[in-house]
Amino acid sequence: MYNYLDFEKPVADLEGQILELKKLAQEQGSVEMSDEIRRLEKRSADALKDIYRKLTPWQKTQIARHPDRPHCLEYIDRLFTEFTPLAGDRKFANDEALQTGFGRFNGQAVAIIGQEKGSDTKTRLKHNFGSARPEGYRKAVRIMEMADRFQLPLITFVDTAGAYPGVSAEERGQAEAIARSTAECLRLRVPVISIIIGEGGSGGAIAIAVANRVYMLEHSIYSVISPEGAASILWHDSTRAKDAASSMRITAQDLFDLKVIDGVIPEPMGGAHRGKEAVIDAAGDIITASLRSMKDIDGETLKQERRQKFLEIGRNI
């Protein structure tokens, strides 16, 4: 059984009936229920298509936050070989919210940075729900510097509600760490590819997403502030997050139209959590195509194109 979202209730009811009938048929050794099971499966598939054909921005936000979506470490495990993680910022500590290291993608050595939310209570606490502290961004800068030094393409996976806003993080220079990470992205003379796999929240996301090629999963979101945060500022009422989401143009489709991103990666019907391997492989195909398109571009041109790309975003929005 999946973790169903509120708006998926019709599908949840039908799939619940299907499971009950399958269990009953197995217990009784009966094949007479197969026609009814097939009928319900068709109704369930049709209901899912109908719901996902007309998703609202707020519903997409809920899908982007779905606890069962594939996370950064799952992408790393499936797409890369010989992954060697690097830990620590050489200044204070290691931040598990940001996963960094080196590996091989289709045999090519690459640098990898990704935000990991965790998949259960224990790992979510370990990874601080994907909200990085200053030491996480300083660790990311370490990897960027090494990628530049050894001329390795950089691939980043973005999935965060935002950088950690706690007092301790502010005391250790959270704003400076985010700014330095963003600036380092702009300085690199290697191909940089960023994929937003869930939430892309505020400076915590942009700090590792200033890339030559930026892609979003079909039901991911990308914004300067969460819908709840925007609602709190605009209307002093966080419960109006649904209204805020509708106004903010935070979906992959909106941001592609605005030329903020370079493309949208399709998800299986029902979201990435219903077909993890398929969506990770689709992301891998995009990475392959992006690396191929940049392989003959010199480092200075890559740097200047990246800077120009983000200057244009600032001018046009």
Curated annotation (Swiss-Prot):
InterPro entries: Acetyl_CoA_COase_a_su (IPR001095), ClpP/crotonase-like_dom_sf (IPR029045), COA_CT_C (IPR011763). Residues 40-293 form the CoA carboxyltransferase C-terminal domain. It holds the Pfam family ACCA. Its EC number is 2.1.3.15. PROSITE patterns: COA_CT_CTER (PS50989). GO terms for cellular component: acetyl-CoA carboxylase complex. Its main location: cytoplasm. GO terms for molecular function: acetyl-CoA carboxylase activity; ATP binding; carboxyl- or carbamoyltransferase activity. It is found in: Cytoplasm. Keywords: ATP-binding, Cytoplasm, Fatty acid biosynthesis, Fatty acid metabolism, Lipid biosynthesis, Lipid metabolism, Nucleotide-binding, Transferase. One of its GO terms (biological process) is malonyl-CoA biosynthetic process. The keyword Oxidoreductase does not apply. Component of the acetyl coenzyme A carboxylase (ACC) complex. First, biotin carboxylase catalyzes the carboxylation of biotin on its carrier protein (BCCP) and then the CO(2) group is transferred by the carboxyltransferase to acetyl-CoA to form malonyl-CoA. Acetyl-CoA carboxylase is a heterohexamer composed of biotin carboxyl carrier protein (AccB), biotin carboxylase (AccC) and two subunits each of ACCase subunit alpha (AccA) and ACCase subunit beta (AccD). PANTHER family: ACETYL-COENZYME A CARBOXYLASE CARBOXYL TRANSFERASE SUBUNIT ALPHA, ACETYL-COENZYME A CARBOXYLASE CARBOXYL TRANSFERASE SUBUNIT ALPHA, CHLOROPLASTIC. Belongs to the AccA family. This is Acetyl-coenzyme A carboxylase carboxyl transferase subunit alpha. It comes from Brucella anthropi (strain ATCC 49188 / DSM 6882 / CCUG 24695 / JCM 21032 / LMG 3331 / NBRC 15819 / NCTC 12168 / Alc 37) (Ochrobactrum anthropi). The gene is accA.
